[in-house]
Every structure is written in C-alpha cells, then in structure tokens.
From Swiss-Prot:
One of its GO terms (cellular component) is cytoplasm. It comes from Bacillus subtilis (strain 168). Pfam families: Aldolase. Its EC number is 4.1.2.14. This is 2-dehydro-3-deoxy-phosphogluconate aldolase. The active site is at E43 (proton acceptor), K130 (schiff-base intermediate with substrate). Keywords: Carbohydrate metabolism, Cytoplasm, Lyase, Schiff base. The record marks T157 as: Plays a major role in determining the stereoselectivity. Induction: Induced by galacturonate and negatively regulated by the KdgR repressor. Is subject to catabolite repression by glucose involving the ccpA gene. GO terms for molecular function: (R,S)-4-hydroxy-2-oxoglutarate aldolase activity; 2-dehydro-3-deoxy-6-phosphogalactonate aldolase activity; 2-dehydro-3-deoxy-phosphogluconate aldolase activity. GO terms for biological process: D-galactonate catabolic process.
Length: 196
C-alpha cells in the first residue's frame, strides 16, 4: 500500500489502537473487540509475543489498517514488513532504521520528541511523525512544535486517554495513538472521537 494511501487512511481512522499484550491470543481478541467498536487502525507493538503472527492474521482484512509498533531494529522492521504490516512505527528516531526502511515498501512513522529529532527526520523526508510521549507534555507542547514545523503531521501517542482524542485532533493532530485505556471504552464512547 502506498504511503499517501496509508497516511490518508490513518487520518480517516483518527484513532490508532496501540496493542501491547503479554499474550498473542489476548491481543487478537483485543483487536477483534476494538474492530467491533469501530476502530479502523491498529498498531501491534513488538513487545507483544508473536507480534508478526498477529499482524499476519489481520493483513488481508479490508476493515483494518494493521501496523507494527515499538519497532527498534532493522530485524524487527523486516519481520513486520514480511508479516504484512501496512505501516511501521518506532518510539524514537534512528538514522540507521530510517535508512533500512527506505528499502522496504512499508510506510514508516518515526518517533520524535525534540526539535532536533524533528529536523533530523525531515532531512530523511519524513513528514508524518509519532510525537512520543505526548500525554506527559500535553497539547500546548504539540502546538508549539507545529509553529516552526508546519509541514509535519504529528501523531501524538503515549499517555492519552480516549476522551482526550477529540481535543488533540482539533489542535491539529493527524491521528492519535491510544493504548490500554481503550479496552474500557464502549462503542458509544468512541463515537465522539469519530465525529471530530
């Protein structure tokens, strides 16, 4: 899937469910439950046992954009791409990982936090960036970074409650990553997110 298509689908999804589990079966059940609630983008972290198998089991579903998260090595990136990940996310920026992923036809979203990291990511041509950990710094932090970097689409992730997602989207986020707190949300709770 082409990068522009992936970026557009992530923006349409608005919320990216970040799956971090101790068990492969539990992770698959979480994903199915989230799909029933209307979630359309899922990032399976590579701290989850069997992450590649989980991605592979959802790769042909048309109702989901499935990606790999917490990818910190070229080996993990290769495994994720082979499993069928439609996007790959790392918690930070690594020039080595960025260079490796330039040869893989999977959309890459590097993580950043500082202006220096953003500038380095831009030199590699990345304009959609995971802002991590966003919940600690809040919306004003993202807005301050957007001032000098208007060409960047931020995907804030880390410590964000689902009820806060609409505020992040209104502040300019392209999409928002949310983790474990999604499990307690009902389909109705998530409608507020999808309406923004």
């Amino acid at each position: 899937m082409e990068s522009k298509v992936v970026e557009n689908r992530l923006k349409e999804a608005k919320l990216i469910a970040v799956i971090r589990s101790k068990d492969k079966q539990e992770a698959c059940q979480q994903i199915e439950s989230l799909l029933d609630k209307g979630i359309r983008a899922v990032e399976v972290t590579y701290t989850t046992p069997g992450a590649s198998d989980i991605i592979e089991s959802f790769r042909n579903r048309e109702d989901i954009l499935i990606g790999a998260g917490t990818v910190i090595s070229a080996q993990q990136a290769g495994e994720a791409a082979k499993a069928g990940a439609q996007f790959i996310v790392s918690p930070g920026f690594s020039a080595d990982l960025a260079e490796h992923l330039s040869f893989v036809k999977t959309h890459y979203i590097p993580g950043v936090l500082t202006p220096s990291e953003i500038m380095e990511a831009l030199t590699f041509g990345f304009t959609t960036l995971k802002l991590f950990p966003s919940g600690v710094f809040g919306i004003p932090f993202m807005k301050n970074l957007a001032g000098p970097f208007p060409q960047v689409t931020f995907i804030p992730t880390g410590g964000i409650h689902p009820s806060e997602v609409p505020d992040w989207l209104r502040a300019g986020a392209g999409a928002v990553g949310v983790g474990s707190q999604l499990g307690s949300c009902s389909k109705e709770d998530l409608q507020a997110v999808f309406q923004v």
